[in-house]
């Protein structure tokens, strides 16, 4: 039985989909004005892991992850760069897709862009105006009137007074209440705009997700996810919009992943500890980054540091070494086992962990227990199950030898794969000629470069430290 921690009720709840056998899920994606950072990577990997597990349980998953391609930050960056905002967003959408692919993230069922659904947003704003939940300000902006929605604050667990006192809200003399948020922004020079009943303008950020989720998933769906930073105001405002239009709850389970910190400090450009995914991937294999993310529970803070990434790399290397050592033969890979979820003790433990609010740290612990058993017994069946269960988390699917030969850190001065293979052949020839001094010299040169040779009756293999 799958249980999910629901942010709205602040409790673990048994997961019961609205439609048997089907899960409809929406996750807030990127605002594309820059490269993905580690916080984005966590959202991508966390909800990819959720989708994978739901599919493993046999559900058909309709997964929508939007792209915000019109926003104040996008417009500001495009003006700074002296380029069309559409060119800017196209570039960073491509970069985001490349980063997601590198991290092993499965493409969502749908990836709508906000600019393609402006008509739906206008229709939703009209419905809110008709229900007197919104108003047109004197400057042409349209605002949501939070005092007209009695449930405002229920996701964040705060009253209107608490929110006014404790949250930073934009001061705008056109608002009736400081917490009122914009649904439609009147056009300004040099900004993209669309025709509307209130004049030319563009949608506010919050209405975008309400409109796109309804377009693909209807007025009620199973799971809405995103980063913890979106809980207020973004998701709070989505509730006000969608429930305001339809008069009922539109999401059954709210999921939020925790923050990413760097060396126990908040990640920010001002502190000089802001890292993009691309920067991290110049130093670590993509699978190491994915493994680092899934080793932590999705709701816990994730602390990025070189020490933690190096530890993740070493741990993943141990698992791949087990797969390499217990392949049926030197030249073949471990076959992926068919998982017996009912009768295999390791599979049952793995399922129990994942059904407990997607407890990936406990699931990873099962992988290491399997690895230990494979080493203890030498039985390749354990390695096969290790690979199969790892695949559920999007891990351990590379050929082991290929993974182990990947450079630990990408830097100048390292031997290429071709150079390493040539030196191994030179060493082999030296040994045939009984020139053991030359063979030892070649081994030492490779060892100094972080290349470990492993001799066996089947030949010599190598890996990087």
UniProtKB/Swiss-Prot annotation:
<feature type="binding site">
    <location>
        <position position="238"/>
    </location>
    <ligand>
        <name>Zn(2+)</name>
    </ligand>
</feature>
<dbReference type="GO" id="GO:0008270">
    <property type="term" value="F:zinc ion binding"/>
</dbReference>
<protein>
    <recommendedName>
        <fullName>Cysteine--tRNA ligase</fullName>
        <ecNumber>6.1.1.16</ecNumber>
    </recommendedName>
</protein>
<dbReference type="Pfam" id="PF01406">
    <property type="entry name" value="tRNA-synt_1e"/>
</dbReference>
<keyword id="KW-0479">Metal-binding</keyword>
<keyword id="KW-0648">Protein biosynthesis</keyword>
<dbReference type="InterPro" id="IPR056411">
    <property type="entry name" value="CysS_C"/>
</dbReference>
<keyword id="KW-0030">Aminoacyl-tRNA synthetase</keyword>
<feature type="binding site">
    <location>
        <position position="209"/>
    </location>
    <ligand>
        <name>Zn(2+)</name>
    </ligand>
</feature>
<feature type="binding site">
    <location>
        <position position="269"/>
    </location>
    <ligand>
        <name>ATP</name>
    </ligand>
</feature>
<dbReference type="GO" id="GO:0006423">
    <property type="term" value="P:cysteinyl-tRNA aminoacylation"/>
</dbReference>
<keyword id="KW-0067">ATP-binding</keyword>
<feature type="binding site">
    <location>
        <position position="28"/>
    </location>
    <ligand>
        <name>Zn(2+)</name>
    </ligand>
</feature>
<keyword id="KW-0862">Zinc</keyword>
<comment type="subunit">
    <text>Monomer.</text>
</comment>
<feature type="binding site">
    <location>
        <position position="234"/>
    </location>
    <ligand>
        <name>Zn(2+)</name>
    </ligand>
</feature>
<keyword id="KW-0963">Cytoplasm</keyword>
<dbReference type="Pfam" id="PF23493">
    <property type="entry name" value="CysS_C"/>
</dbReference>
<dbReference type="GO" id="GO:0005524">
    <property type="term" value="F:ATP binding"/>
</dbReference>
<dbReference type="GO" id="GO:0005829">
    <property type="term" value="C:cytosol"/>
</dbReference>
<dbReference type="InterPro" id="IPR032678">
    <property type="entry name" value="tRNA-synt_1_cat_dom"/>
</dbReference>
<dbReference type="InterPro" id="IPR014729">
    <property type="entry name" value="Rossmann-like_a/b/a_fold"/>
</dbReference>
<dbReference type="InterPro" id="IPR015273">
    <property type="entry name" value="Cys-tRNA-synt_Ia_DALR"/>
</dbReference>
<dbReference type="Pfam" id="PF09190">
    <property type="entry name" value="DALR_2"/>
</dbReference>
<dbReference type="InterPro" id="IPR009080">
    <property type="entry name" value="tRNAsynth_Ia_anticodon-bd"/>
</dbReference>
<feature type="short sequence motif" description="'KMSKS' region">
    <location>
        <begin position="266"/>
        <end position="270"/>
    </location>
</feature>
<feature type="short sequence motif" description="'HIGH' region">
    <location>
        <begin position="30"/>
        <end position="40"/>
    </location>
</feature>
<dbReference type="InterPro" id="IPR024909">
    <property type="entry name" value="Cys-tRNA/MSH_ligase"/>
</dbReference>
<keyword id="KW-0436">Ligase</keyword>
<comment type="similarity">
    <text>Belongs to the class-I aminoacyl-tRNA synthetase family.</text>
</comment>
<keyword id="KW-0547">Nucleotide-binding</keyword>
<dbReference type="InterPro" id="IPR015803">
    <property type="entry name" value="Cys-tRNA-ligase"/>
</dbReference>
<dbReference type="GO" id="GO:0004817">
    <property type="term" value="F:cysteine-tRNA ligase activity"/>
</dbReference>
């Amino acid at each position: 039985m799958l249980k999910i921690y629901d942010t709205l009720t602040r409790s673990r709840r048994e997961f019961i989909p609205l439609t048997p056998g089907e899960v409809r899920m929406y996750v807030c994606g990127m605002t594309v004005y820059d490269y993905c950072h580690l916080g984005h990577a966590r959202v991508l990997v966390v909800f990819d892991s959720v989708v994978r597990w739901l599919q493993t349980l046999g559900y058909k998953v309709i997964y929508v992850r939007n792209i915000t391609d019109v926003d104040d930050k996008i417009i500001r960056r495009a003006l700074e760069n002296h380029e069309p905002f559409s060119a800017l967003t196209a570039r960073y959408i491509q970069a985001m897709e490349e980063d997601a692919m590198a991290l092993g993230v499965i493409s969502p069922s749908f990836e709508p862009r906000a600019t393609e659904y402006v008509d739906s947003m206008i229709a939703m704003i009209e419905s809110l105006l008709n229900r007197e939940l919104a108003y047109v300000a004197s400057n042409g902006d349209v605002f949501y009137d939070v005092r007209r929605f009695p449930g405002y604050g229920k996701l964040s667990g705060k009253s209107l007074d608490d929110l006014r006192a404790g949250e930073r809200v934009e001061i705008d003399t056109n608002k009736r209440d400081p917490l009122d948020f914009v649904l439609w922004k009147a056009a300004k020079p040099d900004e993209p705009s669309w025709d509307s009943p209130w004049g030319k303008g563009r949608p506010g950020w919050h209405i975008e997700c309400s409109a796109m989720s309804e377009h693909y998933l209807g007025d009620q769906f199973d799971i809405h996810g995103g980063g913890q930073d979106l809980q207020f105001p973004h998701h709070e405002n989505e509730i006000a919009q969608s429930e305001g239009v339809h008069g009922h709850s539109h999401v059954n389970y709210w999921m939020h992943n925790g923050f990413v910190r760097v060396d126990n400090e908040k990640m920010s450009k001002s502190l000089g500890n802001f890292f993009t995914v691309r920067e991290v991937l110049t130093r670590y294999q993509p699978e190491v980054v994915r493994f680092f993310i899934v080793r932590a529970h999705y709701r816990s803070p994730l602390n990025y540091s070189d020490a933690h990434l190096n530890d993740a790399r070493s741990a993943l290397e141990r698992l791949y070494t087990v797969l390499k050592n217990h392949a049926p033969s030197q030249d073949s890979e471990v076959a992926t086992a068919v998982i017996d979820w009912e009768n295999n003790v390791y599979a049952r433990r793995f399922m129990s962990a994942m059904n407990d609010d997607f407890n990936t740290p406990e699931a990873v612990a099962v992988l290491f227990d399997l690895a230990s058993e494979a080493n203890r017994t030498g039985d390749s069946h354990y390695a096969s199950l290790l690979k199969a269960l790892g695949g559920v988390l999007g891990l351990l699917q590379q050929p082991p030898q290929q993974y182990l030969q990947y450079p630990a850190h990408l830097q100048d001065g390292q031997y290429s794969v071709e150079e390493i293979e040539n030196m191994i052949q030179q060493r082999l020839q030296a040994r045939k000629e009984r020139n053991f001094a030359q063979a030892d010299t070649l081994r030492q040169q490779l060892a100094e470069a972080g290349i470990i040779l492993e001799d066996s009756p089947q030949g010599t293999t190598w890996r990087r430290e």
